[in-house]
């Protein structure tokens, strides 16, 4: 099977949306019956994003096999219907770690280890390894051309054209074409300079995708084509849109997929984008608008909750409801400032780590429980829902998590068993942590649902598979008293009986789960828990109008 590689680089500034562009292009090519995969190369020194603050990097997307990866992999999965694995994302730190381990073992037979060829060879090997079962491999290179961190990756993809043949490689450069409002003009000079930098590395882009506030007119595209040495048909205008789900159609309308298929000499059927038409239609046509509050501590960067926000939108599509998402800093609720919660039709508390903002989250859960507002807790959102119920309903004021208070007298949430340094008193001391990364319960795990429960009804099956990312879990030895007071466990892991789902029966909609259902939601299908949560929030609005 002939393998064709499409390398996507970025220029001028970061955060132009290379991940969305790669996912959208992948969706179009997948619709042409091509076997697609997408790889993200990240130029930072961290081995993976698992220990990076969400405020700096955005959410950590967990794959089925338990890899902690860049949030762009979430876009890839949602757009191309393909499950990503640990092979689909690697970093400079991961590559150097791999090379240094080999050097320590003596695999290089005493050679002097250098960026070229050892690091670049390792990068190429990882790319090729991930491409085994695909005939089109899209590779997104993080960062911006000109950054020193990206140089080994750029050199590696330059060499790929030499290794496998230039005819099997396309270089796409995504660049900014700014619109200067005071002059009323689009400026192409930054793009020209970015391409010049790319040429200095030895890479001639084949296609330019021009990100701009407005559509780049033909005469400007001709100018870019002339100065950047690409055909005018290969200069694609990608203007700002109000929905990322419009981008596949936007690229298709400019025949980007035709250009690529002709370049690779692929005789494949035209892309049918009907499913994307349906998504766009669902997004525009709704019968109701509701307000959902996400109570968190990383709200300075909305990307920290990217998959949760997308899953809420997907659920809105399925219910013909527009979801207005409000990101609320949990610390603002700590002084019982319930005024900011009054207009919410649903409250969601997502995953997180550490004790900052926990009081505000506990108060938000209490407010939702007592005022019959639909509540959805995810990961940490389940753990603190249990703590809130234990403290305020059961009356166990000492109930807490050892993550927040290692000395607590009633550790209803505690460290996962059988982990290194399992004592929470020791683990919470930084000097006693051998490695923080890779010490969690990660990836897809089976869960058994209780008969006659809401979760069983929504999933319509007894055994479900969902993705996890947590270091703490419910202490089964202390939970019986809480369960007897009315907080039902309706889902447990098959392997070790871990509490996975809780429900409160005397409430319109109160459900929380230890896993992360947002990672498997798609714009076409949504996710059963999110869909019913939004449905319930819609009912709440009608009841309180």
From Swiss-Prot:
Enzyme class of the recorded protein, top EC level: ligase
Amidoligase domain, as annotated region: 1-266
Positions of ATP binding: 15-20, 72, 239-241
PROSITE patterns: GATASE_TYPE_1
UniProt note on regulation of activity: Allosterically activated by GTP, when glutamine is the substrate; GTP has no effect on the reaction when ammonia is the substrate. The allosteric effector GTP functions by stabilizing the protein conformation that binds the tetrahedral intermediate(s) formed during glutamine hydrolysis. Inhibited by the product CTP, via allosteric rather than competitive inhibition.
Any single GO BP term: 'de novo' CTP biosynthetic process
Chain's role: Catalyzes the ATP-dependent amination of UTP to CTP with either L-glutamine or ammonia as the source of nitrogen. Regulates intracellular CTP levels through interactions with the four ribonucleotide triphosphates.
PANTHER family (alphabetical): CTP SYNTHASE, CTP SYNTHASE-RELATED
Subunit: Homotetramer.
Protein name: CTP synthase
């Amino acid at each position: 099977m002939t393998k064709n590689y499409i390398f996507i680089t970025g220029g001028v500034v970061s955060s132009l949306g290379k991940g969305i562009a790669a996912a959208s292009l992948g969706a179009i090519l997948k619709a042409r019956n091509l076997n697609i995969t997408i790889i993200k190369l990240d130029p930072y020194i961290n081995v993976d994003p698992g220990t990076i603050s969400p405020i700096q990097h955005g959410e950590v997307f967990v794959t089925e096999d338990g890899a902690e990866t860049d949030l762009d992999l979430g876009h890839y999965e949602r757009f191309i219907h393909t499950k990503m694995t640990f092979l689909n994302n690697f970093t400079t730190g991961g590559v150097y770690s791999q090379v240094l381990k080999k050097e320590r073992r003596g695999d290089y037979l005493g050679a002097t280890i250098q960026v070229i060829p050892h690091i670049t060879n390792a990068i190429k090997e990882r790319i090729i390894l991930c491409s085994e079962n695909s005939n089109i491999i899209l590779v997104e290179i993080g960062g911006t051309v000109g950054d020193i961190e990206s140089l080994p990756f750029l050199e590696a993809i330059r060499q790929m054209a030499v290794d496998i043949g230039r005819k099997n490689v396309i270089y796409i450069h995504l660049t900014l074409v700014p619109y200067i409002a005071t002059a009323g003009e689009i400026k192409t000079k930054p793009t020209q300079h970015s391409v010049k930098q790319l040429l200095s590395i030895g890479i001639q882009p084949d296609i330019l995708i021009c990100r701009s506030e407005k559509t780049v007119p033909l005469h400007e595209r001709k100018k870019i084509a002339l100065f950047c040495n690409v055909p005018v048909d290969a200069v694609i205008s990608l203007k700002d849109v109000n929905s990322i789900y419009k981008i596949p159609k936007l690229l298709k309308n400019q025949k980007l997929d035709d250009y690529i298929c002709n370049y690779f000499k692929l005789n494949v059927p035209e892309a049918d984008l009907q499913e994307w038409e349906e998504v766009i239609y669902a997004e525009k046509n709704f019968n109701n608008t509701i307000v959902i509050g996400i109570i968190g501590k990383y709200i300075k960067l909305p990307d920290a909750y990217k998959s949760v926000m997308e899953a809420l939108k997907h659920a809105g599509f399925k219910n013909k409801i527009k979801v207005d998402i409000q990101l609320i800093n949990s610390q603002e609720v700590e002084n019982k400032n319930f005024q900011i919660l009054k207009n919410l039709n649903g409250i969601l508390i997502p995953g997180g780590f550490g004790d900052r903002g926990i009081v505000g989250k506990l108060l938000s859960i209490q407010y939702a429980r007592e005022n019959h507002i639909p509540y959805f807790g995810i990961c940490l959102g389940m753990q603190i829902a249990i703590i809130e119920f234990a403290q305020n309903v059961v009356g166990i004021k000492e109930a807490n998590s050892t993550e927040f208070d290692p000395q607590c007298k009633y550790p209803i949430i505690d460290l996962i068993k059988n982990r290194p340094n399992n004592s929470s008193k020791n683990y919470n001391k930084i000097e006693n942590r051998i490695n923080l990364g890779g010490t969690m319960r990660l990836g897809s795990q089976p869960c058994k649902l209780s008969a006659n429960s809401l979760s069983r009804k929504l999933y319509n099956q007894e055994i479900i598979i969902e993705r996890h990312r947590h270091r703490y879990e419910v202490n089964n030895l202390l939970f019986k008293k809480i369960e007897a007071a009315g907080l039902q466990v309706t889902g447990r892991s098959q392997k070790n009986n871990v509490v996975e789902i809780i429900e409160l029966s005397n409430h319109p909609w109160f459900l929380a789960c230890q896993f992360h259902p947002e990672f498997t939601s798609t714009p076409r299908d949504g996710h059963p828990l999110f869909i019913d949560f939004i449905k319930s929030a819609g009912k709440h609005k009608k009841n309180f109008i």
